[in-house]
């Protein structure tokens, strides 16, 4: 029996980075959701087989083609250390909850079969936004897809990698070491620049 090719749907798609990565890994992109015209034109040209659904706020996961993997890299503006740090519940970054809603709707429609995996990408500042409570809310939201709750208290600091193991699911995270080092690299560069003036 041949292995079934994995399928992918990308929310907050940008220019199709998850789809391109998926193709390189043998995963077939099926749909995307994006509102910015230029990135949509890029993916329409590079990935004409991918169906574009537009604004994530107007989507219902039950109406989307069921996929094995849903990816989301929603706007990081409100949790980024480069931004105002308004947090996960702010207007742009709060779109994260649309990702979880769509996953739940698709799982309900498919009797829990799809999606099998969810991939969330964001900035390193998501760990520290709102003193770490925003990342806890992300984990709680993903656990809620399976109807579970996190009982552990929020740690003083989120580690760069970790996991939550449920009876029939798991959640894992890993922060890019490059992303962690970036603020330190910038600080040192600014110090060098200040000394040279």
Report the location of each language-model feature.
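Conserved active-site and SAM-binding loop architecture
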Residues: 1-197
């Amino acid at each position: 029996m041949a292995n079934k090719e994995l399928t992918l749907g990308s929310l907050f798609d940008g220019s199709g980075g998850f789809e391109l990565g998926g193709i390189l890994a043998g995963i077939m992109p099926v749909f995307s959701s994006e509102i910015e015209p230029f990135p949509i034109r890029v993916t329409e040209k590079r990935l004409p087989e991918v169906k574009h659904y537009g604004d994530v706020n107007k989507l219902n996961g039950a109406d989307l083609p069921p996929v094995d993997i849903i990816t989301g890299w929603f706007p990081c503006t409100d949790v980024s250390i480069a931004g105002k740090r308004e947090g996960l519940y702010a207007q742009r970054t709060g779109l994260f909850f649309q990702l979880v809603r769509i996953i739940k709707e698709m799982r309900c429609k498919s009797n829990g079969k799809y999606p099998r995996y969810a991939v969330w990408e964001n900035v390193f500042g998501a760990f520290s936004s709102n003193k770490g409570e925003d990342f806890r809310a992300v984990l709680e939201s993903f656990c809620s897809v399976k109807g579970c709750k996190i009982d552990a208290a929020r740690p003083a600091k989120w580690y760069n990698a970790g996991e939550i193991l449920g009876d029939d699911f798991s959640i894992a995270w890993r922060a890019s070491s490059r992303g962690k080092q970036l603020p330190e690299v910038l600080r040192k560069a600014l110090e060098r620049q200040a000394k040279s003036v």
